[in-house]
């Protein structure tokens, strides 16, 4: 799992870009004492000419090329959910989120099946926008992703943008040994599509926990599932992890978009954290 190109370390590439220009960076690209936990979303204070500000811009992205190749509808919907979840994981809110899409598809060549791919993707993204009340206000598209017999996978990358206060931003590396860690996830239907009422309940619960200062670190589960989340959260401070429950391989590696792995602050009552699907207590 860790060796997958979508999951493995991209530190060498990331460090080619200067993340400190303007001295407004809130979250560096890698967190923790050892700077090995990748940050899922960008957070930087807005530049001002005079004085100081704590107003912080946040931006996260979402895209699963494998899911999109199987079903552009599922892929686009999940991209929107993933991008917004990453914003929430570091302290944002979905109610103050705006989207921009980057779309890239094969040449349609007047083929109804090929035309169906961008149509399906746009319907999936539209469904997510309507359900969450987050509109896409910009983007860039191309329908030239074909070279001879090679086509790009159906591509709709979602970027979610929001604002928060710098003091509310949460980084993603585990902070200390002995913390309680929970998994909160929404419900999904028989077609593996997220239940949006359940998803909004999850989003609101995570936002409330962060706003109340009850979260030490938070990770929006994405392509690599819970296993990716736990591994990368552990790297930054070299804190190990032990599961209290036995998880199946499917539960460990399944990409459940809209789910969160959360390290709780000391003294948080787990019985008060309840949504439609029971939380799963895990421990460091």
Briefly describe each language-model feature range.
Residues 1-272, 276, 280:
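Glycine/proline-enriched, intrinsically flexible loops and inter-domain linkers
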């Amino acid at each position: 799992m860790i060796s997958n190109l979508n999951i493995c370390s991209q530190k060498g590439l990331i460090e080619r870009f200067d993340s400190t220009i303007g001295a407004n960076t809130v979250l560096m690209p890698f967190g923790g004492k050892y700077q090995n936990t990748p940050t899922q979303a960008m957070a930087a204070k807005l530049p001002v000419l005079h004085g100081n500000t704590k107003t912080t811009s946040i931006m996260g992205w979402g895209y699963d090329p494998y899911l999109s190749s199987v079903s552009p509808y599922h892929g686009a919907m999940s991209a929107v959910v993933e991008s917004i979840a990453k914003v929430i994981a570091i302290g944002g809110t979905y109610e103050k989120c705006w989207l921009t899409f980057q779309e890239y598809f094969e040449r349609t060549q007047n083929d109804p099946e090929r035309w169906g791919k961008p149509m399906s993707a746009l319907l999936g993204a539209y469904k997510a926008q309507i359900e969450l009340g987050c509109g896409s206000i910009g983007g860039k598209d191309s329908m030239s992703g074909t070279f001879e017999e090679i086509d790009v996978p159906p591509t709709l990358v979602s970027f979610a943008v929001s604002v928060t206060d710098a003091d509310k931003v949460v980084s993603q590396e585990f902070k200390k040994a002995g913390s309680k860690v929970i998994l909160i996830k929404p419900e999904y239907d028989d077609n593996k599509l997220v239940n949006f009422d359940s998803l909004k309940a999850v989003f609101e619960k995570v936002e409330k926990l962060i706003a109340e200062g009850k979260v030490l670190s938070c990770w929006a589960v994405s392509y690599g599932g819970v296993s990716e989340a736990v591994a990368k959260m552990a790297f930054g401070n070299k804190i190990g992890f032990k599961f209290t429950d036995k998880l199946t391989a499917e539960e460990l590696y399944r990409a459940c978009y809209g789910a969160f792995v959360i390290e709780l602050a000391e003294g948080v009552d787990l019985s008060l954290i309840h949504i439609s699907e029971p939380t799963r207590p895990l421990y460091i």
